[in-house]
């Protein structure tokens, strides 16, 4: 049986697409090994059939501290890859994959890079010269070296099975009640706990007859304050620190307000659920902004930058969309036009390389 290594670390945005790819590869008869860092350990569940290995690499701004750590991690990765003897390694980007990718270069294991964002990350860019193929989600990806253009294959993003099972949720689900789902992705969003309730207050002042249902991710220490505001506004709500099966919330929502991580965007694209994106300004290479702007430019979503946003601006945007449902329908249609079966297309590419 041929063995394949998938490498991802850091956030759920890297982890869950890699698991979805692993599930498809297992269905095709491969033995799948998954190298992750300690931060991803919390996402592992009993029903995942891939074989996990934890190889941690702590980031440091001090090069004299980081290089010894990297050297040790690379040696561990070389030993691990030598024992597994994979036919190919697939890297999902981010600094946690560095040691495994260096080990693959040293052992001459074929490398495939997967970039879910519209802006090629620094780590993925570094390894483009060693990669056999570069799988991308956005056709006009930014920051791609000229020499690497002949290596790219547009596979689209990879979406979890429970989200794929939803199919399309496009179109209004309740004419009398408009449901907004607010979440900050796997990294959360403290900003939303203040911004969203303030925006909803302004929205209700402008349109008192509006019937809203709010589903919102919020930290426990913010929930009491948020509940008080929604109760005073006579709004039904659902608050949680984390949604274990986000497909249930997607299914009920008419509009999403979220960050613009690649995994979130690919899930919303797959099911045709329109969103207002507030990109995380501190995201590496500002990639969330480029993700959201790409969708806005193709009329498949809306991008509001955190530095320029206010409760009033957000309320106006929500009111505009609620008052003009044709805009929401068009955005849903444009999202679905971009949908791809990324888990299958990337699996096909892996088989070509093997």
Curated annotation (Swiss-Prot):
Q: Which GO terms describe its molecular function?
A: UDP-N-acetyl-D-glucosamine:N-acetylmuramoyl-L-alanyl-D-glutamyl-meso-2,6-diaminopimelyl-D-alanyl-D-alanine-diphosphoundecaprenol 4-beta-N-acetylglucosaminlytransferase activity; undecaprenyldiphospho-muramoylpentapeptide beta-N-acetylglucosaminyltransferase activity
Topological relation to the membrane, as annotated = Peripheral membrane protein
Which GO BP terms apply? carbohydrate metabolic process; cell division; cell wall organization; lipid glycosylation; peptidoglycan biosynthetic process; regulation of cell shape
Glycosyltransferase in keyword set = yes
The reaction(s) catalysed by this protein are: di-trans,octa-cis-undecaprenyl diphospho-N-acetyl-alpha-D-muramoyl-L-alanyl-D-glutamyl-meso-2,6-diaminopimeloyl-D-alanyl-D-alanine + UDP-N-acetyl-alpha-D-glucosamine = di-trans,octa-cis-undecaprenyl diphospho-[N-acetyl-alpha-D-glucosaminyl-(1->4)]-N-acetyl-alpha-D-muramoyl-L-alanyl-D-glutamyl-meso-2,6-diaminopimeloyl-D-alanyl-D-alanine + UDP + H(+)
Q: Where do the annotations place UDP-N-acetyl-alpha-D-glucosamine binding? A: 11-13, 117, 160, 186, 288
Q: One Pfam family from the UniProt entry?
A: Glyco_tran_28_C
List, alphabetically, the GO terms of the cellular component aspect.
plasma membrane
> Which pathway or pathways does this protein act in?
Cell wall biogenesis; peptidoglycan biosynthesis
What domain of life is recorded for the organism? Bacteria
Subcellular location field: Cell inner membrane
Q: Per its UniProt entry, what is the enzyme's top EC class, as one word?
A: transferase
Q: Which InterPro entries match?
A: GlcNAc_MurG, Glyco_trans_28_C, GlycoTrans_28_N
Q: Which UniProt keywords apply?
A: Cell cycle, Cell division, Cell inner membrane, Cell membrane, Cell shape, Cell wall biogenesis/degradation, Glycosyltransferase, Membrane, Peptidoglycan synthesis, Transferase
NCBIfam families, per this entry?
Answer: murG
Q: Which family does it belong to?
A: Belongs to the glycosyltransferase 28 family. MurG subfamily.
Please give the name of this protein. UDP-N-acetylglucosamine--N-acetylmuramyl-(pentapeptide) pyrophosphoryl-undecaprenol N-acetylglucosamine transferase
């Amino acid at each position: 049986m041929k063995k394949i290594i998938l490498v991802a670390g850091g956030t759920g945005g890297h982890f869950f697409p890699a698991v979805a790819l692993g599930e498809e590869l297992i269905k095709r008869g491969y033995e799948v090994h998954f190298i992750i860092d300690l931060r991803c350990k919390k996402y592992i569940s009993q029903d995942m059939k891939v074989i996990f290995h934890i190889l941690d690499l702590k980031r440091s701004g001090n090069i004299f501290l980081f290089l010894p750590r990297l050297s040790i991690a690379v040696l561990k990765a070389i030993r691990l890859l030598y024992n597994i003897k994979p036919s190919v390694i697939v890297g999902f980007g981010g600094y946690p994959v560095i040691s495994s990718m260096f080990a693959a270069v040293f052992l001459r294991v074929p490398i495939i890079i997967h970039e879910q964002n519209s802006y090629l990350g620094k780590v993925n860019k570094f390894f483009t010269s060693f990669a056999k193929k570069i799988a991308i989600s956005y056709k006009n990806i930014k920051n791609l070296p000229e020499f690497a253009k002949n290596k790219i294959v547009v596979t689209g993003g990879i979406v979890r099975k429970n989200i794929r099972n939803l199919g399309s949720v496009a179109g209004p689900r309740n004419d009398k009640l408009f449901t907004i789902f607010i979440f900050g992705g796997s990294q959360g969003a403290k900003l939303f706990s203040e911004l969203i309730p303030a925006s909803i207050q302004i929205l209700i002042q402008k349109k008192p007859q509006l019937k809203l249902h709010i589903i919102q991710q919020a930290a426990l220490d913010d929930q009491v304050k948020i509940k008080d505001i929604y109760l005073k506004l006579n709004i039904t709500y659902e608050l949680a620190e984390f949604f274990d099966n986000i497909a249930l919330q997607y299914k009920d929502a008419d509009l999403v307000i979220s960050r613009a991580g690649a995994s979130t965007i690919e899930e919303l694209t797959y099911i045709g659920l329109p969103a207002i994106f507030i990109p995380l300004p501190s995201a590496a290479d500002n990639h969330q902004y480029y993700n959201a702007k790409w969708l806005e430019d193709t009329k498949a979503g809306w991008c509001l930058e955190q530095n320029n946003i206010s409760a009033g601006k957000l309320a106006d945007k929500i009111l505009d969309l609620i008052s003009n449902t044709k805009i929401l329908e068009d955005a849903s249609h444009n999202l679905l036009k971009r949908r791809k079966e990324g888990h299958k297309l990337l699996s096909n590419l892996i088989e070509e390389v093997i």
